[in-house]
Amino acid sequence: MMLNIFRDSPCMNNPIHPSAVLYAGSRIFPQLAACEHFAGSEKMLGKALRIQAELSVDGVPIFDITADCEDGAPAGREREHAEMIAGLILSGENRFDRIGVRIHDVRHPAWRDELETIISRAGQRVAYIVLPKPENAKDVATQIAALDELRSRCGIAREIPVHVLIETPGALHEAWEIARLPHVEVLDFGLMDFVSAHHGAIPATAMRSPGQFDHALVVRAKCGIAAAALGNGIVPSHNVTTEIRDANVVREDARRARQELGFLRMWSIHPAQIQPIVEAMRPDFAEVDEATTLLAAAQDAVWGPIQHEGKLHDRASYRYYWELLQRAQSTGMNIPADARQRFFS
């Protein structure tokens, strides 16, 4: 596969990395693992951490872990549960600093204590905070303001990303406003609560496949979330599948979420779901091969226009292939040694 470069390729001692040149001051699209695994109990979180280490490729985890305060904490023991999670985040078992935390929603009395416990103890290492069940953008803004106040009080300079769980009609209606709020890097879809919020108008069959990909209101919601997220330069994350025994069902759900609806990430609620989700979310191998060849030639041309198989490529196509190559790397695909050296060393 030959590339005809319009100008001579300079011999560069210090080649320019794509992230430094392809975005021209605009926000760089978040590059996150394709799978987000939820666990609530200390036992299941410990198991998830071991699997995260076992499945890592070249020191990069192929899935994130979300420690769950909302559904994981026993009633009345929310603070103790948050303290346990903070301890895990600070522990040596957390090798990659890719543990996020879902706190309670803004109407629950425990959410402020949970957030304060996590940020005051583990704010330097928590990967992200998940905010569930907002009714509108104001709810999200309230919790983000509390997060920022805690960061300031605790002397935490780093940004702590926020993931927002869209699972009510009101939040769906304001998804674009939510996606524009500070620190938000993911919009998640909560299918079960979304269906329940429609008072029986959406049948229970839409909570699982194939109904979740067929019912008009559910598909509309998914398309709206993906469009709002991608339109604001953040990641759309697909809901769970309730199937835990048949890996083919999990894989097909993830494939449809990715290819039909534009989701770049998906929840897992059982360890057996992780690998099928990651596999289904991987880019096509042929496109990865093309990306490595094209990006190497573009870098040699100092990111100027090049010709490839009779077609002109410039920075717009470079951004596409660069983000594709990053997805390949984050899902554990085999990246040629030259591309690893150029872009990921």
Explain the meaning of each model-derived region.
Residues 2-345:
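Expand to "…catalyze enediolate/carbanion chemistry for C-C bond making/breaking, isomerization
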